[in-house]
């Protein structure tokens, strides 16, 4: 019984708020610029009053203290950050090349995970014409960097005129007849 009364009260409040908003239509655009500006200013002021009235009519209840969100926030507030160990100052070096890799592996296993050096995947490779994060050679298409594989520069004007100075790119389906 109490739930139905609350629902009817909520519907009555919503109808009242809707009626208040309908009493404030957007001003029609006849008149001078000053008149239109004043109408917009008065409508904006009236709108602020309606919003304040609607907020006083319908207030949102506070969520109960035992809500799952509140419990999750309390758990997050209870977390602490542990002290991180100091990084090692020197790594042991072995003189033998066969034991070198094994010694490094043992050193990395003994270090905490946060101090093991990890190279980013997006670091540029040492070889020219290789894409980042890839071991495949890049085939430059027409209109690329302007050089062929031997480092000779290509002129796009000569290519368009039909006098080819660069060899065709393999695997792209472009040949002299299609140009």
From Swiss-Prot:
Residues 34-44 have a biased composition (Basic residues). Escorts unspliced or incompletely spliced viral pre-mRNAs (late transcripts) out of the nucleus of infected cells. These pre-mRNAs carry a recognition sequence called Rev responsive element (RRE) located in the env gene, that is not present in fully spliced viral mRNAs (early transcripts). This function is essential since most viral proteins are translated from unspliced or partially spliced pre-mRNAs which cannot exit the nucleus by the pathway used by fully processed cellular mRNAs. It is found in: Host nucleus, Host nucleolus; Host cytoplasm. The gene is rev. InterPro entries: REV_protein. A motif (Nuclear localization signal and RNA-binding (RRE)) lies at residues 35-49. Homomultimer; when bound to the RRE. Multimeric assembly is essential for activity. Keywords: AIDS, Host cytoplasm, Host nucleus, mRNA transport, RNA-binding, Transport. One of its GO terms (biological process) is mRNA transport. This is Protein Rev. Residues 24-44, 82-102, 141-179 are annotated as: Disordered. Residues 91-102 have a biased composition (Polar residues). Residues 16-24 are annotated as: Homomultimerization. Gene3D superfamilies: 6.10.140.630. It holds the Pfam family REV. GO terms for cellular component: host cell cytoplasm; host cell nucleolus.
